[in-house]
C-alpha cells in the first residue's frame, strides 16, 4: 500500500495498492472483499471499480491497483505517485536490503507490518516511536502481538520493575494455517485450523526485547492458535520486584488506561461477562481484562485482549501519521483549570 501527503495540512491518503494479479477479474474480487467482511461486517462507504484505469474508487477517492510480483518491477513516478510512504504487508521482504527495493522504486519511507530482521527499528506506536529520526527510511511496525503487550509491559515495568515474564498468546487462526489437514513447513500448523488448538512459537519475545531493551533476557513466550477467526488474548505472567495486590495493580492499570499518554492504545474493562467477540473492531492495541487479574505476593498474571486485525491496523495508521509528521488537533480542546 502507498500513502502520500496531499492537500491543505498535508493529510495523507491511500494512493495505490501493489498486488499479484490472481485472475482476469481480480479488481472486481478485490472490490468485493473490501465491501464485505465476514468478521467486521459490511464496509461503511462506497466502492466503485474503474476497470479502464485499474482503479478502485473508495468513498470518492481513487486508489490505483498496480499489478506486480516484486517491488523493483514498479516505478511509482510512472503512476504520478511521488515520494510515497509504502506500507509493506506481504511479510515476504523483512530486512533492509530487500525492503530497499521500495526506496529504489521511488518511495520516501517504508513501514513493514511484521517483525523486522537485522538492525531495523521495531516501533510500537505510542511507546517507543520517540526513537525515530528523519534518517530512518525503513522501519517495522512490529506485530499485532508485540503492539498488544509492549504498552502493558512498559507501564508495569515503569512502576513495579519486572524480574521475569512469560508471555502466552491465545491467537486466532491466520491465513498462514491450513483450512483442512495438509502439508505445512511449520510444526503442527499443517493441521486444520478450524478444528484444532495448535501449540506454536511466537516471534513476539524477540521483538518485545528490541522495543523494550530493559527487558532483554527476562522474557519467554509461546503461542496457541485456536479455532476463532479474530481477536486474540495475551496472558502475561510476571514476577515483580515487590509484592502487589489485585486491587493495587488493577487500580494502577486503570489509571494508565484512562489518564496517561497510553490512554488511546490501552483499554480497560471491568466486566465478568466479557468474551472474545466483544472485542471485534476494538480500536485499542490491547484491553486489560481486570476481572481476570491474578496476584500472589510478587507474582501477577494479566489477561489482555486485542483485535489482531483492527487494533493492529490502527497502530500502523498511527505510526504512518507519525512518520508523515501529521498531527491532528484533539477536539474538543481540554479545559485549563486555574
Where are these regions (language model features)?
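N-terminal Rossmann-like NAD(P) cofactor-binding subdomain of oxidoreductases
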Residues: 1-179, 183-190, 294, 318, ...
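Alpha-helical scaffold segments in soluble metabolic enzymes
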Residues: 1-4, 101, 151-155, 207-214, ...
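Glycine-rich beta-alpha junction loops
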Residues: 19-23, 116-117, 143-145, 169-176, ...
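Short clusters of hydrophobic/aromatic residues that line enzyme substrate/ligand-binding pockets
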Residues: 56, 123, 138, 180, ...
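Conserved active-site and cofactor/substrate-binding residues in soluble primary-metabolism enzymes
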Residues: 81, 97, 143-151, 165, ...
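Catalytic core of tubulin tyrosine ligase-like
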Residues: 161-223, 238
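Short, flexible, solvent-exposed loop/turn segments with mixed acidic/basic and small polar residues
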Residues: 185-186, 224-228, 291-294
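C-terminal active-site/capping subdomain that shapes the small-molecule cofactor and substrate pocket
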Residues: 221, 233-338
